[in-house]
């Protein structure tokens, strides 16, 4: 039975306060406003004083507006009919299609029991050499993409969504510009990837509280697909916008701020989402790749700083490329011994030589004389950046290995590479 109240104690922006009993945290309510009904979510409890975040904002609400508690949290529909659909942060269709009501599940549930998980040992191929070869993405891994503003992180996510060898893509956009939303939609449609994808999109003009629901919507749907035996890749952008939405609501609620004004539970809120990554023992999997922009390119900003303690590595996007120094996949050793015999040796030695190339660049910029070895390194670095680091490169893993060997063969003798002789004998280009 619904609890109905017709007295609002206070209205502070989009947050209203009522006195109610038997209400739980995260419960939904329906608020009657002068412009129609709006959903609201309980986000603070102090005895019988209940604070609710109104999705549509405080406009049109009076102290006599009716508040009807629904006795449940936010639900999201789940079925194969979700594939190819686009929704907002409340689960309402954005694509003009019909609303879905079957198989509804509650969002924001607990993480999977570790006893039900298996150790990550399977690779997700993306067709991007800087991921597949040098920082392999592993099934059930959770990884952020740290990026400055202006970097092509949404283009990178779209590439991964189109090319990743998984069963289902769940894309969550938080605080997206409308142009970015249209870009994702058109890119997936043109590539024929929308038919295996579900999009939950919150744009910058949508209610703030919906931004907080996007990751939970995505992860609830992803978990249900995984329980049906599907391998799911969840792509989120931008987790800094998610944290800023938390910060905005915390300020309205007059919570005591922590580092740079963010709420004190920022770490827990981020961890509760990332920990949904899982490889089920007897079903599918959920893998999470999330963009985290760094304001002012500051990796010590609270959002990337806290994220780094939660995730299993990170990708750094810099100058339009995935930077090899600083980027790390902590689970890559679980899979790169199973791909091809030369994977680890090629990966390690190519990065070692690229580091030497960076030193040679610095040496040249300071006016030092270039040795024959330095010239070889400069040639190698240019080829490495053009044929493997460039984000427009789209080649299978085995072709990326062969390209790496060809680059080494053009620039060095076998002895100069530092790769062991049995691999040289097998893979060195003729």
UniProtKB/Swiss-Prot annotation:
GO biological process per UniProt: proton motive force-driven plasma membrane ATP synthesis
GO molecular function, one term: proton-transporting ATP synthase activity, rotational mechanism
CDD domains: V_A-ATPase_B (cd01135)
Keyword Transport: yes
SUPFAM superfamilies, per database record: P-loop containing nucleoside triphosphate hydrolases (SSF52540)
Coiled-coil boundaries: none
InterPro entries: ATP-synt_VA_C, ATPase_F1/V1/A1_a/bsu_N, ATPase_F1/V1/A1_a/bsu_nucl-bd, P-loop_NTPase, V-ATPase_su_B/beta
Keyword entries, A-Z: ATP synthesis, Hydrogen ion transport, Ion transport, Transport
NCBIfam families listed in its UniProt record: PRK02118.1 (NF002555), PRK04196.1 (NF003235)
PANTHER family xrefs: V-TYPE PROTON ATPASE SUBUNIT B
Family named by the database record: Belongs to the ATPase alpha/beta chains family.
Free-text function comment from the UniProt entry: Produces ATP from ADP in the presence of a proton gradient across the membrane. The V-type beta chain is a regulatory subunit.
Name of the molecule in the record: V-type ATP synthase beta chain 1
Record organism: Treponema pallidum (strain Nichols)
């Amino acid at each position: 039975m619904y609890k109905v109240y017709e007295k609002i104690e206070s209205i502070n922006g989009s947050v209203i306060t009522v006195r109610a009993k038997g209400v739980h945290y995260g419960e939904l309510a329906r608020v009657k406003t002068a412009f129609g009904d709006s959903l609201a979510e309980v986000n603070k409890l102090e005895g019988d004083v209940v604070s609710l975040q109104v999705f549509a904002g405080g406009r049109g609400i009076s102290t006599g507006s009716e508040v009807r508690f629904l006795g449940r949290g936010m639900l999201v529909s789940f079925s194969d009919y979700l594939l190819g659909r686009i929704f907002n942060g409340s689960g309402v269709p954005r694509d003009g299609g019909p609303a879905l009501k079957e198989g509804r599940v509650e969002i924001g549930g607990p993480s999977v029991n570790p006893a039900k998980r298996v150790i990550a040992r399977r690779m997700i191929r993306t067709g991007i050499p800087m991921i597949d070869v040098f920082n392999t993405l592993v099934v059930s891994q959770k990884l952020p993409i740290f990026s400055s503003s202006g970097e092509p992180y949404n283009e990178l996510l779209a590439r991964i969504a189109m090319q990743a060898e998984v069963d289902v893509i769940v894309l969550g956009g938080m605080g997206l510009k409308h142009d970015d939303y249209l870009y994702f939609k058109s890119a997936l449609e043109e590539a024929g990837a929308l038919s295996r994808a579900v999009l939950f999109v919150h744009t910058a003009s949508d209610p703030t509280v919906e931004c907080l629901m996007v990751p939970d919507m995505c992860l609830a749907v992803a978990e249900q697909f995984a329980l049906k035996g599907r391998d799911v890749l969840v792509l989120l952008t931008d987790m800094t916008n998610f944290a800023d939405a938390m910060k905005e609501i915390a300020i309205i609620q007059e919570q005591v701020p922590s580092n740079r004004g963010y709420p004190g539970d920022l770490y827990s809120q981020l961890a509760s989402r990332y920990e949904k990554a899982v490889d089920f023992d007897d079903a599918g999997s959920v893998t999470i790749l999330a963009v985290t922009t760094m304001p002012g390119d500051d990796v010590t900003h609270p959002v990337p700083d806290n994220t780094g303690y939660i995730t299993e590595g990170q990708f750094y996007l810099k100058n339009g490329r995935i930077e090899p120094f600083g980027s790390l996949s902590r689970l890559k050793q679980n899979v790169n011994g199973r791909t091809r015999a030369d994977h680890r040796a090629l990966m390690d030695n190519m990065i070692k030589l690229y580091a030497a190339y960076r030193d040679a660049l610095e040496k040249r910029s300071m006016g030092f004389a270039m040795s024959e070895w330095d010239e070889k390194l400069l040639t190698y670095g240019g080829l490495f950046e053009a044929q493997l680091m460039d984000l427009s490169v789209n080649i299978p893993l085995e072709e990326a290995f062969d390209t790496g060997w060809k680059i080494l063969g053009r620039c060095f003798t076998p002895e100069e590479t530092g790769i062991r002789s049995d691999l040289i004998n097998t893979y060195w280009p003729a």
